[in-house]
Each structure stands twice: as structure tokens, then as C-alpha cells.
Amino acid sequence: MRPSLLQYLKLLLLLALGGVTTMHVPKQDVPSSLEELTLDGHFSFHDVSAAAQDFGNLSSFPPVAVLHPGSVADIATTIRHVFLMGEHSTLTVAARGHGHSLYGQSQAAEGIIISMESLQSNTMRVNPGVSPYVDASGGELWINVLHETLKYGLAPKSWTDYLHLTVGGTLSNAGVSGQTFRHGPQISNVNELEIVTGRGDVITCSPEQNSDLFHAALGGLGQFGVITRARIPLEPAPKMVRWLRVLYLDFTSFTEDQEMLISAEKTFDYIEGFVIINRTGILNNWRSSFNPQDPVRSSQFESDGKVLFCLEMTKNFNPDEADVMEQEVNTLLSQLRYMPSSLFHTDVTYIEFLDRVHSSEMKLRAKGMWEVPHPWLNIIIPRSMIHKFAKEVFGKILKDSNNGPILLYPVNKSRWDNRTSVVIPDEEVFYLVAFLSSALGPHNIKHTLDLNYRIIEFSDKAGIGVKQYLPNYTTEQEWQSHFGARWDTFQQRKKAYDPLAILAPGQRIFQKASASLPLPS
């Protein structure tokens, strides 16, 4: 059996027996010494059920305690205390932001959860000088960062699609969206970090100071420390956004047009693609938010039974520059090979566009459709393999499926800092592909996980060279394969910054170490 498929088979077996995976481990005594720590915040020992859940809603690993830090010192004190307990203690620590992990990565079975959102305070500081930046807590939500920086007419350059995530959470992974082709992921847009390591040391780091820890933590899956503060560079924020969508029937034209746009000097400010399978009335659905360029022809378009490819783009502008924006957009559109009847557009404020997923969230919450299992699969595919992948996955594996959005868009490797811990293909252009399924009931979860299994199995056998984003592995062999030649560096950094493997146990990369280590002075 191929090791890269084990986690899916385990989940399939468990779900066939009845639903969400819950880990029950022998209950260790709550270390009474935790109650004796002097803190600005406090521990919770009883009301900890929320910390045993995440957005995936597929795993539940109850902690023994939740720390609600009142300061960075609280986090350092707690981690240092666990470190001093030594190798014989099984206690681990996980930082939990907004809990948007999928398979329990932000959980710590019978360990300590740090509620990072408790660290939100009035410490966010915007420096609007010549090289503007914002200092934000690792527990701050990106939407709050946006609101604060817009007061100065500024904003970060790189975003995620969903802004109700914490700064430390996305920087521990990568942080990608339609701006990534131009600015790189969020981890390529950081000036400085403050980190609490697995020894309990508070360290300020940057590309010039403690650079190894800086690059290790970015995309480091929480393995080397808890990000408690980040300094994010800013740029002037536009007031408005022209938001466009078009459709393609041909995958080759769809991908070639995207690749042309991300390589052009003058292009759109945001570019993402979507794959649409077995969706009826797609253009009619767009009418609630967008205006058709050709109302008559768009009303006659039939999407039933077709695989369609949607290209979504934006152009930023200020109201007094609307005419120039119109000319630039029309010039770019004239170079694309989309179906003319499918052009839809609308003008919205910058914040309305960036916070667009939250608007969808509110609608889904009202229907009870948000807090459901999300067996997502996020992968990165080399450009040279994207057509082979698409032919099998969209033409065969998923031809009868309709479980949720599928994102597919290219980015430029040159915009990613190869010193960070994130793993990407070794080609100048690669594709981010996300299968964002929602599942209701054990049967639907099992069906979706089975499709994920088939996608990964095909990719392995066909030599696609897939790398998982938000990776979900369970064995050291799988992680070694994921990191490849970078595994030795990742291990060495772990030994340097978290030698007892206290941090982020939910990633299932390292077991808590057993080593003879000098205690910190």
C-alpha cells in the first residue's frame, strides 16, 4: 500500500463506522504546576471543547487545558514550563488561531492549546512613513489588520481569500490568493517576526537578524515557534475594484490566458481560476452580484452537463482614474479567448472585494451550512503536468461530482522565497489547485475522501509531482517524501528551536522527543 494514501484510508474506515474522528487517550493528570504559573491571562481546564474542533470538522482531539494569554510573556512562561518538565512529560502545546485547520493540525490531544485570539489587543501599530508597515499580533485577524491600515490609506500587498484568519496562522502555512502571482504569498511579504520557540525563548527575527529562525517559521507549520507578532509591509490602498468573471469551454485556452496574464508587465491585480462541474444556471447565479456585458446572449447560455472554466480578475482603481481603468481592462480583455456572452463585471469597494468570502459565510451560516465537515484537498502542481492532471481529474474522477468550488490558478515561483519552510515544485510556473468540498453526513464525507484518495493515487502513479498545501500526512516517511531534499534542514531546525518536539503536535510530523538536553539558564 502506498504510504501517501494511508491517512485517507484511515479516515474512510473511521467514517464508515460513524462520522467524526475523536481521539481518546489516557487522561493524564492536569499538571497542578500550571495553576501556579503567574500569568496576565488565565488557563481554562474544564470548558475546553471548542479547542477540540476546527473548520474541517473531521477530527476532535480534546486538550487538557487552554491558555488564554494576556501577554506574550504568558506564552513564553507556559512553553518554558513545559520544556522544563523534560522529555518524560507527554505534554505538548499548540497555537490555535481561528481554528481553520482541516484535519486537527491546530489541536493538541491532552496537551495545551494557546488561544491566540486572546492575544488581540490595542497593540496593532501602523507606521505610515516612507516604507510603511504594520505591527500586528500573531492572534490578530487579517480583516482587523485591513480595517486598521485603511485608516491610513494603506493595506498589505498579499492576501488570502478569507480574511477571518489570524496573522500567525496564515504565515505558518503560506497565505495565498489571486495576488500571489505578483507579490508572492503572504510569507514573502514579512519584514520581521517575534517568535516564542519551543524552549520558551522570545526572539525577534528578520532577514537580517536571527534569519534562520525567521525563514524556518514562515511556512513552518508551527514547528519552530509560536508567531506572536509580525511586521507586514504596506502599500497605498485603492478605493475601488473592477471585478470581472468570464467563462471558457476549453482548458488549454483557459490556462494559456492565465499564464499570459501572470507574466505580463501590465495586467490585472488579482487573477484566480475556477473549475465548474455539473452546475446549472451558472450565469443566472452571477446576476445577483454582477452585471452581464451582453444580457440577451448570457441569458441564453446553457451550462448543464458541461465542464466550464471561470477566470476571475480584478483591476484596482480610484474614482478619478475610472476612465484609465476602463481602457486598461478593455485592452487586457481583448487579448483573452473567453466566451463573449459570459463576461460579467461589477464595481465594488476594495474592502468589499477582499472580504467577499465572509459575505458568503454569513449566507451559509444562516442556512446551517457553514459548520459542516470540510474534507478539503489543497495541492500544488507543476505547470508541465497541469494538462495531464486536468484530463484525468476533471474528465474522469470528478465528472459526476459537484461537492464545492474548485480553484485552479498559476503563480510565479520567482515571487516565493526559497529560504522559507514551504515546499513548492521546481518549475518557474506552478498551479495552486484547491478542492473545497463541503460534506453532509458520513456517506458524503466518505465519498469526498474517496475522491481525494483517487486524485492523490492518480497523481502518485502518473508522476505528476504534486505537493500538498496545508499538508495532511501521518508518518515520517510521508513527511520525508513531502520535503524531499529539504527534510534534513527541516529536522535540523526542529532540533534547534523545539528540541523536545513540544509544538504543533497536530501536524503529526514529529513525536515528542526523548533527549538529554541542557536546561535554559
Swiss-Prot record:
User: For this chain's UniProt record, which GO biological process terms are given?
Assistant: cytokinin metabolic process
What is this protein's expression induced by?
A: Induced by the synthetic strigolactone analog GR24.
Entry comment describing in which tissues the protein is expressed: Expressed in inflorescence meristems.
Q: Which EC main class describes this enzyme?
A: oxidoreductase
The FAD-binding PCMH-type domain covers 59-237
What are the EC numbers?
A: 1.5.99.12
- The record lists FAD as bound by A95, G97, G99, S101, Q105, D161, T166, S172, V176, I227, Y469, Q507
Cofactor(s) for this UniProt protein: FAD
**Glycosites:** N57, N278, N412, N418, N472
* A Pfam family that the UniProt record links to this protein: FAD_binding_4
| Pros-8alpha-FAD histidine: modified positions | H100
Places the protein is found: Secreted, Extracellular space; Cytoplasm, Cytosol; Nucleus
InterPro entries in the cross-refs? Cytok_DH_C_sf, Cytokinin_DH_FAD/cytokin-bd, FAD-bd_PCMH, FAD-bd_PCMH-like_sf, FAD-bd_PCMH_sub1, FAD-bd_PCMH_sub2, FAD-linked_Oxase-like_C, FAD-linked_Oxidoreductases_BP
Domain of life here?
Eukaryota
Primary localization class, coarse: secreted
| Other comments on record | Plants over-expressing CKX9 form short culms, increased number of tillers, decreased number of primary and secondary branches per panicle and have a very low seed setting rate.
Tell me the function of this protein.
Answer: Catalyzes the oxidation of cytokinins, a family of N(6)-substituted adenine derivatives that are plant hormones, where the substituent is an isopentenyl group. Possesses cytokinin oxidase activity toward trans-zeatin (tZ) and N6-(2-isopentenyl)adenine (2iP) in vitro. Functions as a primary strigolactone-responsive gene to regulate rice tillering, plant height, and panicle size, likely via a secondary response gene, RR5, which encodes a cytokinin-inducible rice type-A response regulator that seems to act as negative regulator of the cytokinin signaling.
Kindly provide the name given to this protein in its UniProt entry. Answer: Cytokinin dehydrogenase 9
The species this protein was found in: Oryza sativa subsp. japonica
